Amino acid sequence: ALITTGVDPTSLIQNNYPNYYEASAQLYETFQQWSSSSAIFVGFNNINFDEPFLRQALYQNLLPEIYMTVTNNNVRMDVFDILRLVSVYSPEHIKFNTDDQGYPILKLDEISKLNNISINYDAGPHDAVFDSLITLELNKILNIRCPKIWNSAYEFRHRDTPKRFMLDNLVFTNTTFWGRRPTIKAQTLIGGIPSRNHHYLVYNLLFDPVKIIELEDKDLIKKMNDGAKRIC
């Protein structure tokens, strides 16, 4: 982190920075103010990266409502996920570099330079405010250039939307990423998981479902454990 941000370790001691609890409490207070009348929390890779750290910080410092981004009518969006979908379904609308296998490199600092995204702020990449402002500008660009993808992401900001979508569509596609590599699967809904809200079982239609439906229970369990991703 020190190498990435360029922070001098001595400055952490010499400057009057807040300690871990104080910083967490400040974040908590700010988020509480934002969410007082419902909020959309937007970031860049915030759902899979930033939020787990935030929740852990709030938990460790005995601050309540660690799930505030998805409770009390609050919702969230991830610009990184929108950008990944654009790189698959509408790559002509955004400039990006590729790795040696041809997959998009979607680092925020590179994307901002390639697409001439600039802000009037005296800092650089990996500064929290700088990255937030760049993310905001990138979000605006994606909304303008790729409105269908952006609007879909906006609709899916609600946690109940996936269930409603799957009930309304017998067959649908699901785009997932393994590292930078996208995978598109045709799937159908099996049902929910009683012990886990907002988690669902779907069937991968790459495999013939008739052969699965006809199996005895013991054979079905064996099939589910053979490594093939029939049910996700």
Predicted regions and their residues:
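Metal-dependent phosphoesterase core characteristic of DEDDh/y 3'-5' exonuclease domains
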Residues: 1-12, 31-148, 156
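A short linear-motif detector with a strong N-terminal bias
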Residues: 20-21, 33-34, 54-55, 179-182
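Glycine-rich, highly charged phosphate/nucleotide-binding loops
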Residues: 15-29
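Short glycine-rich, polar/acidic loop-and-turn segments at beta strand-coil junctions
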Residues: 16, 45-47, 206
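Acidic two-metal-ion nuclease catalytic site recognized across multiple nuclease folds
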Residues: 141-232
